[in-house]
């Protein structure tokens, strides 16, 4: 028999955290294209600096759509390039930074495909003897956004509430 979801003691169970997902997600290709268009119109300008600021919305939120194939990296690439061209240089720095992040994502997929041990072993052998700390209580606090580190906890709570974590 397998575990029940209730036995995992996930938080929060009340209120219904899935309500947040329903408010923030529009699954499918149409939702992905709409999200990309909104990002290119409203979020790309300022991306290079704002992507690392959780108090700003300069993130695309496209990761799940890319993961599930609801939009392709090629589509994102060309739509971003077109937005940059229309802006006549105004978005060049931000667009280039965003495209570099898309390329990093694709590079990671390339590594996962072509380096069979990548998910299970360190990429660099000198890290094989890294002294990992096994602490199930600390792991549970991290998973629930209860570490006591505000930026870490905010990120995990955002993930719980919206299904997305800021950059």
Describe the residue ranges of each PLM region.
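Short, functional "switch" segments adjacent to catalytic/cofactor/reactive centers
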Residues: 105, 121-146
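Poly-acidic low-complexity segments
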Residues: 28, 72, 135-136, 149
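C-terminal substrate/ligand-recognition segments
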Residues: 109, 114, 137-167
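Residue-level signal for pocket-adjacent positions within structured domains
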Residues: 57, 61, 134-137, 159
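Glycine/tryptophan-enriched, flexible segments
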Residues: 1-122, 126
């Amino acid at each position: 028999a397998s575990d029940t979801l209730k036995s995992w003691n996930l938080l929060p169970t009340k209120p219904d955290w899935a309500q947040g997902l329903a408010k923030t997600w529009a699954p499918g290709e149409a939702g992905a294209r709409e999200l990309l268009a909104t990002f290119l119109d409203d979020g790309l300008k300022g991306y290079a600096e704002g992507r690392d600021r959780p108090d700003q919305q300069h993130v695309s939120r496209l990761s799940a759509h890319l993961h599930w194939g609801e939009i392709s990296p090629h589509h994102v690439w060309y739509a971003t390039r077109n937005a940059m061209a229309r802006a006549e240089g105004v978005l060049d720095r931000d667009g280039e930074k965003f495209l570099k992040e898309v390329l990093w994502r694709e590079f990671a997929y390339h590594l996962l495909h072509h380096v069979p041990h990548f998910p299970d072993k360190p990429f660099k052998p000198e890290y094989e003897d890294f002294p990992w700390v096994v602490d199930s209580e600390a792991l549970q606090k991290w998973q629930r956004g209860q570490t006591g580190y505000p930026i870490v906890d905010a990120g995990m709570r955002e993930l719980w509430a919206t299904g997305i974590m800021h950059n």
